[in-house]
């Protein structure tokens, strides 16, 4: 990444993610955006942008926001610690009253909601098991997963998920070097290096799912596993659970084992540990590379990117809601 901290990656899609890791100004001149700071003025043609992730103090002109809204391009904002702050969510053009009504029905109806909540946890658990199997780690996820069908409330389902994830992190620790072991899961703030990467990665994935939901007819605030509170896109939290093992956890393990991320890529405080600018850039570059990575889809019979898998998951949910096909969560097959 250059000194401006503006990284543009992505080999599969014409439009790219742009990651801004330094302070600056985003302004518009006709159909081109410019990222400006004290060191440079970088043009970003609007037809090259898929989404923007800002990790610095970013000032945006109203003209730039109008153009981004017109083109349906979201911006996700993170604070200096890498925690998600919010998103600029463009005017929605794919809204469907019928889909929104069906979404609401599946929240109000207890049986329909619990069915979906269980599906999200089952998908997450099976992907965790795939990660552990990939590294040859014995695990008891299948045993705990048996408790899912007898869970009769969302709270019970969340408790099963919490037990599975705790056992999962303990199992991952068995293959990590001592300095990178997770130990206790700590979040705000994370207290060690791997906790820092998990928190950073989960926030990043959450915003990626928000972008994919924007490109569907789903309302991102209506959710099933996580409570649909105000001021958050809780459906993105639901779908993120399924993809955390695939996109975030495997990537973190790989970065550690290949020594691509080292102790000097973190800043340590009295009670916290966070990725520094060097660490953020390495993490973002690898994340974007993986989003563009493709796998042969077993049902479609063609290669699709990891990013596309997220969108396809949203489409599967829509089919379930409108009664076309029962939802089956994504599970890694490779």
Curated annotation (Swiss-Prot):
Transmembrane segments: none annotated. Its cofactor is Mg(2+); Mn(2+). Coiled coil: none annotated. Its EC number is 3.1.-.-. GO terms for molecular function: DNA binding; DNA endonuclease activity; metal ion binding. Mn(2+) binds at residues 161, 226, 241. It is an enzyme of class 3 (hydrolase). Keywords: Antiviral defense, DNA-binding, Endonuclease, Hydrolase, Magnesium, Manganese, Metal-binding, Nuclease. One of its GO terms (biological process) is maintenance of CRISPR repeat elements. It comes from the Archaea. The keyword Methyltransferase does not apply. Homodimer, forms a heterotetramer with a Cas2 homodimer. HAMAP family: Cas1 (MF_01470). CRISPR (clustered regularly interspaced short palindromic repeat), is an adaptive immune system that provides protection against mobile genetic elements (viruses, transposable elements and conjugative plasmids). CRISPR clusters contain spacers, sequences complementary to antecedent mobile elements, and target invading nucleic acids. CRISPR clusters are transcribed and processed into CRISPR RNA (crRNA). Acts as a dsDNA endonuclease. Involved in the integration of spacer DNA into the CRISPR cassette. PANTHER family: CRISPR-ASSOCIATED ENDONUCLEASE CAS1. Belongs to the CRISPR-associated endonuclease Cas1 family. This is CRISPR-associated endonuclease Cas1. The gene is cas1.
